[in-house]
Structure formats: structure tokens, C-alpha cells
Amino acid sequence: MIHIEDADPDHADAKVLIAALSQRLAAITGSSGQASFEADDVRGPGAAFLLARDEQGRAIGCGALRPLQPGVAEIKRMYAAVSGQGIGSAVLAALEARAKSLGYEEIRLETRRVNTTAVGFYGRAGYRECPPYGRYIGRPEAICFAKPVVFASV
């Protein structure tokens, strides 16, 4: 069973997961993705940082939600320590539910095209490719996705 809880991105467990994600992303894409994440962006109104824990209380996944523009949230720092266990799906569902409860109309995210595992994961979760936004405009290595919150799982 996976338990999802709110956490601060500076919590020790969160830092370990974020560091593991950064290391994995650097190995896959050549970039850790750290430049596009600020802990303060996922604190406060309209934002969240979630940790996934297993039955023994071990931190096994994380994800963040931040305001991007009015009505639109962005998912950041999605990570599952183990693939194929439902961790990523549980974190994503919790982030989508939170976005809905916060009144967002759309969720967006970015990953790298070479990260085919993430591209497939988001596609299976109902996210569709959208035009690049913000810092991703003009960056052909980036692929952006969007999903209306009305279709988000809750």
C-alpha cells in the first residue's frame, strides 16, 4: 500500500528523493533538471509537495505542483524510486486531485524527449503533447504535456 502525504521539499526524505531524481535525469538526459525547480515554488497557496511512503514508512516517491499561470498548474520533480510498482501513478493521481481541489483547470509538465519512459507514462495517464511554454520555448529537447483537470483522476 502506498501512502501519500504533504511534505516540505527541504524535508530530509524529500531531499534524498530529489537528489536521486536529479541523478537519474542526468544519466538519461544529460541534465539534472535542478535548474527548473525552486523549492519555494511548491510552498504556499496553489502549490504542493507530496511524498509517497510504503507500508514501512520509507519514502519511495515524490512530486510537486506549482502555479504556472491563472488556472494552470505545473507538475515538477515527479519521481518513483522503483518502476512498475504503481508509485508514480499514485503520486500523479494525488497531484491531479490536489490540482482539482485548488481550482486549476489544466495541468502542464515538461520532460525531455529522450526520457521515453516518462513520455510513455504521461501519455498513458492521458496527457497530450502541447506547445512549449515558458523556459521550454525554443528548446527542441523538451516535450511539454497538458491535461485538463476535469479529466484528471480523483
Segments and roles (model prediction):
Residues 2-3, 9-10, 105-108, 112-154:
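C-terminal "cap" of GNAT-fold acetyltransferases
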Residues 2-76, 81-82, 92-93, 98, ...:
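Acetyl-CoA-dependent GNAT
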Residues 86:
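Glycine-rich phosphate-binding loop
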